């Protein structure tokens, strides 16, 4: 009987361990902008957020290649079809695919190497709205922000209605898009990096732009922090 109890306890502890390791995350997406933002998430969909409103999503454990982004200048009909000036995702309120540049990105992958979450802010698709991406639990305290006036200071070559394009979107060359995997900092990517040093400014900008927290951490994404 004692052996059976010991095995049962071990099994329960193992199940609890697996549950802890496999836990997803809660993301609180908050709009602090003085204008309406149509938040988008893949996975997750989309939601209109007026000033001060928030939206909760709960991506599952192991989610990767995921992102949250703000859309601006949107109009949707009662069926959730329409168009956005920035960040549009095939004309849908409930996004099923990534948005069109320019849009500021909060990217993440949960429960990855060493059971860590990886997260970043990326300007590889350009910039439309200032953003904060921060952990809110788990003892992880290193948040990241991109709050510079990038739209106002955007180089003429990169200007777009409602935002500032990344040079890859405009020029579509290997120098800026890193299609061959061999690229580095350029004057245009330096423009973004100087203003938002924690954010990705070009596709290979990994060393200074990727951050980690223990799996099971919860997060907030704030527009106009």
Swiss-Prot record:
Disulfide bonds, paired cysteine numbers: 33-224, 74-84, 89-95, 140-213, 146-196, 154-164, 168-177, 178-183
Protein name in the entry: Thaumatin-like protein
PROSITE patterns per the UniProt record, alphabetical: THAUMATIN_1, THAUMATIN_2
Glycosylation sites: 187
Function noted in UniProt: Has antifungal activity.
Organism lineage: Eukaryota, Viridiplantae, Streptophyta, Embryophyta, Tracheophyta
InterPro entries hit by this protein: Osmotin/thaumatin-like_sf, Thaumatin, Thaumatin_CS
Post-translational modification as stated in the protein's UniProt record: N-glycosylated.
Similarity comment: family membership: Belongs to the thaumatin family.
Tissue: Woody stem plug.
Signal peptide: 1-24
Pfam families, per database record: Thaumatin (PF00314)
Entry's localization field: Secreted
UniProtKB keywords: Allergen, Antimicrobial, Disulfide bond, Fungicide, Glycoprotein, Pathogenesis-related protein, Plant defense, Secreted, Signal
